[in-house]
Amino acid sequence: MGFVKVVKNKAYFKRYQVKFRRRREGKTDYYARKRLVIQDKNKYNTPKYRMIVRVTNRDIICQIAYARIEGDMIVCAAYAHELPKYGIKVGLTNYAAAYCTGLLLARRLLNKFGLDKVYEGQVEVTGDEYNVESIDGEPGAFTCYLDAGLTRTTTGNKVFGALKGAVDGGLSIPHSTKRFPGYDSESKEFNPEVHRKHIFAQNVAEYMRLLMEEDEDAYKKQFSQYIKNGVTADQVEDLYKKAHAGIRENPVHEKKPKKEVKKKRWNRAKLSLEQKKDRVAQKKASFLRAQEKADS
């Protein structure tokens, strides 16, 4: 078939159908969303849960959600900006922070449903493959599916750090080791030790040491916040170990106390009838006094 020119006549515009708003904005991949949202027909009203992971310039957002016609319902959420509470005040968007955020989400969700004592997850972090299995006589493991959005799912992406944190925290999420740091595509082998290094930010610590030796000015510029908070390369692993323990001990979100805002008024309040009459009387008296002065 040869080239056919699209004739944009009245019929073309009359029958033209625009794409979904979030597709037009380039925010949602509906091909992927359809498969993440539609539940098996034999499961009736059971929601299909998704673990949503989004990485912004200064934060990492992790949520557990399910779809309804009215919109997505968020069951639980955790953010990287909560990590300073657990002792991590720097590097809130690296792979190690993504792992901590995923772990916080999992522990918070299981605590909400009263399953935190049943499904402890993997307390000893090895970086190796781990899958949560349902325990007989207990409620089944909480199952959800990773929603990476429009993120390019390359090996070593931070999205998979959050996934690993959630799995180690006790959630059942189908996955393989092919996208974790430490997987070699040529030899088809996975090295859990490399993955463990990334979970404890040892790759960052190694770079800190290297930069300190080679160019101290560049080190001071790149790791200014680490220096400000007194974090050295040797302290990084212990920092994350303490954070993991702290998250497991108390994952509950604490609401900030509501601030009492004193309302400011930007326009004049309406005068009552008595005030209006008084105002008129004052103006009259003022006018009469001025007249008397003028006459005298």
UniProtKB/Swiss-Prot annotation:
At the top level, the lineage of the source is: Eukaryota
What the record says about family reads: Belongs to the universal ribosomal protein uL18 family.
**A GO-annotated cellular component:** cytosolic large ribosomal subunit
Q: What is the lineage of its organism?
A: Eukaryota, Metazoa, Chordata, Craniata, Vertebrata
- What are the GO MF terms of this UniProt record? 5S rRNA binding; structural constituent of ribosome
InterPro entries in alphabetical order: Rbsml_uL18_euk, Ribosomal_uL18_C_euk
The UniProt subunit note reads as follows: Component of the large ribosomal subunit (LSU). Part of a LSU subcomplex, the 5S RNP which is composed of the 5S RNA, RPL5 and RPL11.
Checking SUPFAM superfamilies in the record gives: Translational machinery components (SSF53137)
Q: Which organism is it from?
A: Xenopus laevis
Location (main, coarse): cytoplasm
CDD domains xrefs: Ribosomal_L18_L5e
What name has this protein been given in UniProt? Large ribosomal subunit protein uL18A
Q: Where is the composition biased (Basic residues)?
A: 255-268
Keywords, sorted A to Z: Cytoplasm, Nucleus, Ribonucleoprotein, Ribosomal protein, RNA-binding, rRNA-binding
